[in-house]
Amino acid sequence: MKFPKLRKRTVYWAVLTVFALFTIHFVFQYKEHNSHRVQPIVLIPKAFPSLILNSFDTQNEELVPIKLLKNCQIIRSYHTGYEENTKLLGQEPQSNFHKFNFTVFSSMKPIGLDLKQCQLLSSSSQVEVNDAVNMDASLHDILGKLLQDIRHGKLEYLQEIAPFFLPELQLQLNLNIVDRFWYRFSGSSIWLDQYNMYFMISRIAYSPHGVKNQPVVSLTYGQLFDRNWNEVKNINLLVPSNDPSKNGGHDSFRIISFPYFLPIPFWHDIDNTDGNYFGPEDPRLILVRNKQGYEEPLLIFNSYHRKFVHYDDDEDSIMGQTVKFQRSMFMCWPWQYQMGKSNVEGTSNPEYDNKVYNRVIELKVKLLADMKSQKNWTPFISEDSTNKFDSYIYFVYRWANLDVLKCSLLGDVAGDCVFDYRLDETLVPQNKVGPLRGGTQLVNLRQVIPRSVYHRLLPSHREIFIGFARTHLDNCGCGKVMYRPNLVILVKDAADKTYYKISHISSSLSFDVPIIGWNVYKPDDLCFDSNVLIPYSVSNWNITSLELDIEGGRWVSNDQLTLTLSISDSTVHRLDIRGLFQSILDLADRSLFIPVDRETRVIDEFQNGLQNPGSNPLNQDVNSLGVNNDNIVCALDASVEFCFEYGAKFSIPKQEEFYEVEQQEFNEELIDPKKHQYFKILGKYLYDHASVNS
């Protein structure tokens, strides 16, 4: 009778021993795994308060996510061992530069819009460019991660937008055809000096029919790149932020993991996508300095949204309300947040009120309140304020018949805009802006030229802004439409009032970038439908040297600018340009800078003219100083000629046929068996099933 009992005890102790050994082994393996596990890396800004970082005072939990930081490898961007320890920086890429010539039109000789006299305004310039680099990213990997995050319940924002593309996305991934329905382009980037990183955002658009100019939803994807343009994945930034639960008024820091989809709020109606394009479009980044002294990115975009507008019913004297839909311009702070999205929904909605989104504000101009569509504003920052932070952002609203907007960044009036300058006060603001529009942000030369030299080049009341607008030309000789960059130089002079002028503008610029056809199945057919090369951002502009050559009577510089572009709304490219600042210094009319041989006298004359409105030539004859449209029309005329010559060279002889969407889909399915298989599966197992249960 005791034997069975002993046997049970033996088994009991044997099991207990095995369990104990397994537990010890598991704990040992876990510790061994943790000892080799790489800690998450958090980059902190150079200006981050050392006292907070060193103390890890839990009393600062509202200001800094201390608990998260304790589990991370913390690195300042300028850490001496940064490159060796993290291996984030690659080798300097080898680039082949070649000379590129282009024509620039000045504004100093009035020609009365006579195109026959454009040669009086034209001069030749030269820079060096390298081969454009395709900053390709695997859409399969990006969207695979997106699907994984949605399934794991990560981020409420992703759950909200998932019905736009689920369950179709899973099938697209299985068949490896996501690039037939998803498109990544509109890459815009800025250099974050506090982190020694490039911050890039790009637009990822989804078209259920696979027609790239008819996406139902657009998302914004954020990435980080090191100084040599190697993407840095699985890294975190500690950024200055706000507390959305306290109405944005509480300063704090937040950790953002890269890469990621920015949770930008937008109004949408998933059940009504026909003809509606939801989400942020044409994103542009620009750097601003906030009231706390930190530089942070600001994102400019346009988006379709809903408003509830009050109106007066004259019959019963009761205020009524109607729904209004329009496409408007917005500002987004990627490092700041808000609760809910009533500012894009038009009203409070319990479904979204407790969700966290990026902070956005609509840009509003009273004179333009009734316009159904606003887009293609060109942003820039002026340093005319005595504050140490940016209170306003400026926009070129219209290039031809120049209009400049000034919009507040701060307080309750953030987003309110007024016209800071109008070339033609009689022009109705709602008039079409013309073929020259949008493009990159404009770079203030004060942010590029060393402070020690700036006052020797420009009087204190002048600012110069450089960027690349884009020309939109219809039926000019190559397909239905052509887009190309144009170099633009905007000058701001402060006299008794503020004056702006487009001092110089180039014709269309190819930068010798090879174009791919709009139709992905016919990439060599360059003049089918659209021929597109669009500039999106000046990522960086570095002047490595700037010296005065007294004997030669000129300034000599070395500089390099990085430009991002998109080809055929399908790519994100970057291009390096050397010598652009030197070409601007050497412009034939010498109207921008103080002449070397007359430095002191010119400064005195210019300053006196600004301080004495009666003697200021701007008040006497603005046309004589180039405040006109002469160089604009000359540049556009040259751009049309560029398009015509391009079409003559690259058009494939055939009868033009522009199909409707249904016909285009049918033709592509014949060419692409996988796409045909995809729609066949959807029709059999998804759409038919859905219709039965509807």
From Swiss-Prot:
Disruption phenotype: Leads to a hypo-filamentous phenotype. Keywords: Cell wall biogenesis/degradation, Glycoprotein, Glycosyltransferase, Membrane, Signal-anchor, Transferase, Transmembrane, Transmembrane helix. It is an enzyme of class 2 (transferase). Belongs to the BMT family. GO terms for cellular component: membrane. One of its GO terms (molecular function) is mannosyltransferase activity. It comes from Candida albicans (strain SC5314 / ATCC MYA-2876) (Yeast). This is Beta-mannosyltransferase 8. Residues 30-694 are extracellular. It is a single-pass type II membrane protein. One of its GO terms (biological process) is filamentous growth. Its EC number is 2.4.1.-. Glycans are attached at residues 101, 542. It is found in: Membrane. Residues 1-11 are cytoplasmic. Beta-mannosyltransferase involved in cell wall biosynthesis through beta-1,2-mannosylation of cell wall phosphopeptidomannan. Plays a role in the ability to produce hyphae in the presence of three bacterial species. The chain crosses the membrane at residues 12-29. Pfam families: BMT.
